[in-house]
């Protein structure tokens, strides 16, 4: 059986590598809009985004790290209820955790090579679910009760129907237009958004809660960006386009940095949660680990995770920047400001609530929301559909890769 200390060191380095790939793959989204508006060159934008990711560690909350560490799979599968573990049990627990992380990294690399703006966050969740399900069955995946699930579906479903029907009636009776199916569905989704966000936090948990917020977070980003863009249009309607662009070029520097900070605090916490879980399972206490019985992230883990994601941002992601900034919609500085501010608000809210969401989804939807203020045809929906299908397959595909990675880890660890 392999040396325990060496395995722990390698496991922690692998998680930091995940954060690096997260930055390489996901954090480019933070600069997509500021590159599209030509406020900054790609090189300067990447440097600013990397700095913002690192500054994200001052956002004092570890709620997402706790959700990742103990809110997706049953930690009893990892032996948390029977510490300290024997070497064999510890190696098996590490095989599950590392299977999930390695599966997520593999999926990140695959989608980066394809140029798809998929989600590292959901790849990690899928990898953990796949590894845990293969190791201990689907019962190891945390799910809400049937009663809570049905209540959630009933309330949000009624809100969706009410919103869609109201929009349909408004378009037919008041505007005397023929309503489009897409806008009718979108109206229903936006109406159901508030009850979904509130009830999702109260009634749901585990995988179902994450899937709900996987849909809700982009809609929040879209709604905030769309609304903010409409406010900007209203306030600056008497100004010349040249003056508006000049003013918002400076403001977009602030909004882009704000988005980078919220991205850093949101995404770095995924790696922080995994490393803290490793320390808990290995029964490593202070100063390197959390106190017994607590899920407290050590400062060195916070520092290392943010440094890793910042370095990843600095070194890559250009193909995805091109997809996000040039092929979704064309942007002006005021639109970039609206998209980044709306997306940043959505990410900051999710960080405070402890909900792991996809920064990729949020900024893509925010860009589409801003583009839709001009006209729906201004958004290149073909690219949006491609991104949408990439979202849909991320969790199941990365779960499959996580299963394979777990099997390989068991062989490597000799358990």
Where in the sequence are the language-model features?
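Multi-pass alpha-helical transmembrane bundle typical of ion/small-solute transporters
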Residues: 1-415
């Amino acid at each position: 059986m392999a040396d325990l200390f060496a395995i722990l060191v390698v496991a922690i380095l692998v998680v930091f590598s995940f954060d690096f790939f997260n930055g390489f793959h996901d954090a480019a989204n933070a600069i997509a809009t500021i590159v599209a508006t030509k406020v900054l060159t790609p090189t300067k934008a990447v440097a600013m985004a990397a700095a913002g990711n690192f500054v994200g560690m001052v956002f004092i909350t570890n709620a997402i790290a706790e959700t990742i560490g103990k809110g997706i799979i049953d930690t009893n599968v990892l032996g948390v209820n029977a510490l300290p573990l024997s070497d064999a049990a510890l190696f098996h627990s590490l095989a599950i955790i590392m299977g999930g992380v390695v599966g997520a990294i593999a999926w990140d690399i695959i989608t980066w090579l394809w140029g798809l703006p998929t989600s590292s966050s959901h790849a990690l969740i899928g990898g953990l679910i796949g590894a845990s399900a293969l190791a201990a069955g689907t019962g190891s995946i945390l799910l809400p009760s049937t009663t809570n699930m049905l209540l959630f579906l009933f309330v949000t479903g009624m809100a969706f129907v009410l919103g869609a029907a109201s929009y349909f009636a408004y378009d037919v009776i008041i505007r005397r237009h023929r309503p489009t199916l897409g806008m009718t569905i979108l109206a229903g989704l936006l109406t159901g958004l508030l009850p979904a966000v509130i009830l999702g936090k109260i009634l749901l948990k585990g995988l179902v809660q994450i899937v709900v917020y996987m849909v809700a977070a982009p809609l929040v980003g879209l709604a905030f960006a769309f609304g903010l863009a409409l406010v900007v249009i209203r306030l600056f309607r008497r100004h010349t386009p040249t003056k508006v662009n000049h003013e918002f070029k400076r403001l977009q520097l602030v909004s882009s940095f704000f988005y980078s900070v919220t991205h850093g605090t949101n995404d770095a916490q995924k790696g922080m949660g995994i490393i803290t879980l490793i320390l808990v399972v290995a029964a490593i206490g202070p100063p390197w680990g959390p106190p017994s019985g607590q899920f407290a992230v050590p400062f060195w883990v916070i520092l290392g995770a943010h440094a890793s994601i910042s370095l990843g941002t600095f070194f890559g992601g250009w193909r995805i920047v091109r997809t996000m900034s040039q092929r979704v919609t064309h942007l002006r500085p005021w639109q970039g400001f609206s998209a980044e501010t709306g997306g940043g608000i959505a990410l900051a809210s999710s960080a405070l609530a402890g909900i792991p969401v996809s920064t990729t989804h949020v900024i893509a939807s925010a860009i589409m929301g801003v583009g839709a203020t001009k006209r729906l045809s201004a958004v290149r929906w073909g690219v949006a559909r491609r991104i949408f299908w990439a979202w849909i397959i991320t969790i199941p595909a990365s779960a499959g890769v996580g299963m394979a990675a777990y099997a390989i880890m068991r062989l490597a660890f000799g358990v």
